[in-house]
Regions:
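C-terminal, non-catalytic "cap/extension" segments appended to globular domains
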Residues: 10-14, 21, 25, 113-118, ...
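Long, K/E/R/D-enriched contiguous segments that form extended
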Residues: 294-338, 372, 398, 445, ...
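Catalytic zinc-binding patch centered on the HExxH motif and its immediate surroundings
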Residues: 315-317, 350-370
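Conserved helix-loop functional segments at active or binding sites
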Residues: 328, 332-339, 365, 395, ...
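Short beta-alpha connecting loops at secondary-structure transitions
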Residues: 373-377, 405-415, 444-453, 472-474, ...
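Post-HEXXH active-site segment of zinc metalloproteases
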Residues: 385-388, 399-423
Length: 599
């Protein structure tokens, strides 16, 4: 096989592909389950108008809905994994299209379940919860019930549903404008060859060692945003207005409170994150000064903050070697964890290598009762792919242990917890790799990587989180959200987080208009809390705190049985305090000290 060309799927050895037979032994078996779902889901209407009739009736409805969901999850998982391995395969595209049409119909048919559970009177609901027949559904029923104060009348809910497309349209407008309509042109790379500048390639230009190329990419990229800045300000403004409207319509005190309510996160946790990071910006500013000095620049600009301080190290690590490094790094978690992961990786949980039509990047996904699967595009000369494997393995083991321990209805964990397990694995890998090498260049590379990870997930995402809070508060106060308001508020944050050692080009103010996550408000703070919780948990395990390993494994196994803060507290980390964030900030400063000594 010519290694300079991307192989076709058929050219990849079977042992290097994931084994989807755990889901379905054949496409025909998938079709059988799909047909069963098609013929069975209409039976949901048998319970319409009757959910609160009796304990027995509600239990029957929940069990039937569960049986349906298990089938739906599995057929969906199989189809999505096949499409990920070859996005051009017409059979795979057809299956996914069939599913999407069916899901719409099922969603409409099942839409009565939650409102009817919320409509059960308080006395009857309390009696239902105490009945042994509903014991295994208690957590789910309580989570549904706690939303009751924020659910409106049937007529009002219908009006909100009818308006949802209009309220959500700003996200689509933003995506179409930035991904399709905006054209960024081409740049001459370091070899003098023309390269397209796009949303996806912009980041690749910023890590180039050629300062002039980074500068050109930055200005050319933001010139296009400047041409559309008023439109982008309008779409963001109306997205914020939609958030505030929904929060007020559902009787929340603020859009922030509305977003945090589902996971039972107090606003004080969000505010505490911002306060803790704000109070510890000095080491970040020191890091930028180190960057300026090491890169040999008279002044540092934002486009100089992504290029690695240590040039990409030459490496040749096979997938099997990467797997062994990851497994060795996870030894502190004990045999149950390491043996299960090793057996899974050797047993074709992972689709290892790039092939034509395969989805780029990496992910982990699972469905109840089957192994989790990992998509990789592993390259033996890209050292960061070892980290990617550790990261995705963390997600997979979280899913694996939760599903093997909990009932279906309690196994799924929220996004707030999802990044904890994956980042935890990266922390253990970093610790292991630093223990295994005395090579100063390799140590500097690993430490610089960890510093930049913390910078990107804790400092940068907290800055974004603060911006979201500011602009929603302005809207709630009645202030107009204009282009100048967005740029002014964002520049204040840039000045605080970058410090006086970074030259702030005027174009950088436009960065606030290009962040897709701002159209899914108050999401990004979860990256900051996730990395903080992961580092705090990893430090407990690595320092040998009694019971830390058992507590961490208990966290992985708990799934969605409790709300996120309770789950993490049981594992030994209290996110209601600033301690985990401050622990991560101290690690950042320790690593910075080490990097300064090495460089």
């Amino acid at each position: 096989m010519d290694e300079t060309k991307t192989p076709t799927r058929d050219e990849i050895p079977e042992t290097d592909k994931w084994d989807l037979s755990h889901l379905f032994s054949s496409a025909d078996k998938w079709s059988e389950d799909f047909a069963w779902i098609q013929s069975t889901y209409p039976r949901l209407t048998t319970w319409k108008g009757r959910a609160g009739e009796s304990v027995r009736t509600l239990a029957e409805l929940l069990e039937f809905d569960k049986a349906l969901d298990l089938k739906i999850e599995r057929v969906s998982h199989y189809a999505s994994l096949q499409l990920a391995e070859d996005s051009a395969n017409p059979d795979y595209l057809s299956r996914m299209g069939q599913l999407q049409n069916l899901f719409t119909k099922i969603g409409e048919t099942a839409s009565f379940i939650v409102p009817e559970i919320q409509a059960i009177d308080d006395e009857s609901f309390a009696r239902f919860l105490d009945d042994p027949a509903l014991k295994k559904w208690r957590t789910r029923l309580q989570k549904i019930r706690r939303l009751k104060p924020h659910v409106l009348s049937e007529k009002e809910e219908r009006l909100l549903a009818l308006g949802s497309s209009a309220l959500d349209g700003y996200d689509d407008t933003f995506s179409q404008l930035t991904d399709v309509d905006m054209k960024f042109g081409v740049l001459l790379d370091e070899k003098g060859e023309e390269r397209p500048l796009t949303q996806s390639s912009f980041g690749a230009f910023l890590v180039k060692r050629d300062h002039g190329l980074r500068k050109s990419a930055f200005h050319k990229f933001y010139d296009e945003f400047k041409d559309h800045q008023f439109t982008l300000a309008a779409t963001l403004s109306y997205s914020v207005k939609a958030d505030v409207f929904r929060a007020r319509a559902r009787n929340y005190n603020s859009a922030l409170e509305a977003s945090l309510f589902k996971d039972d996160i107090p606003v004080a946790v969000y505010d505490g994150l911002i306060a803790a990071v704000r109070a510890n910006l000095a080491p970040l500013h020191r890091y930028y000064e180190l960057r300026r000095r090491v890169l040999g620049l008279e002044e540092l600009h934002a486009y100089d903050t992504y290029v690695p301080l240590v040039a990409e190290i030459e490496t040749d690590v096979s997938f099997d070697q990467a797997m062994e490094k990851v497994l060795a790094s996870l030894a502190p978690l004990g045999g149950e964890y390491v043996d299960s992961l090793g057996k899974g990786l050797r047993g074709r949980w992972c689709d290892r290598y790039e092939s034509k039509g395969k989805r780029s990047g990496a992910f982990s996904s699972g469905s109840y009762g089957a192994p989790p699967y990992i998509l990789m595009n592993y390259k033996r000369d890209v050292f960061s792919d070892v980290y990617t494997l550790a990261h995705e393995a963390g997600h997979s083991m979280h899913t694996w242990l939760a599903q093997r321990t909990q009932l279906y209805q309690e196994a799924d964990y929220p996004i707030f917890l999802a990044e904890v397990a994956s980042t935890f694995n990266e922390e253990l890998l970093t610790h292991y790799l630093l223990e295994q090498t005395n090579d100063s260049k390799m140590r500097a590379y690993i430490i610089n990587r960890q510093i930049d990870d913390i910078r990107g997930t804790l400092f940068r995402q907290t800055m974004f989180a603060e911006f979201e809070k500011v602009i929603h508060a302005l809207e709630e106060s009645g202030a107009a959200l204009t282009l100048e308001v967005f740029k002014t508020e964002y520049r204040k944050l840039l000045a605080a987080y970058f410090g006086s050692g970074v030259m702030l080009d005027p174009e950088l103010e436009l960065e606030c208009l290009r962040i897709p996550h701002f159209y899914n408000a108050f999401y990004v703070y979860k990256y900051s809390t996730g990395v903080s919780a992961a580092i705090a948990l990893a430090e407990r395990v690595l320092s040998g705190v009694p019971g830390a390993v058992e507590a961490y494994l208990g966290f992985l196994k708990s799934g969605g049985t409790k709300f996120p803060l309770e789950t993490l507290q049981a594992a030994g980390v209290d996110m209601r305090t600033s301690a985990p964030v401050e622990s991560t900030l101290r690690l950042f400063e320790r690593r910075l000290n080490e990097l300064e000594d090495l460089l």
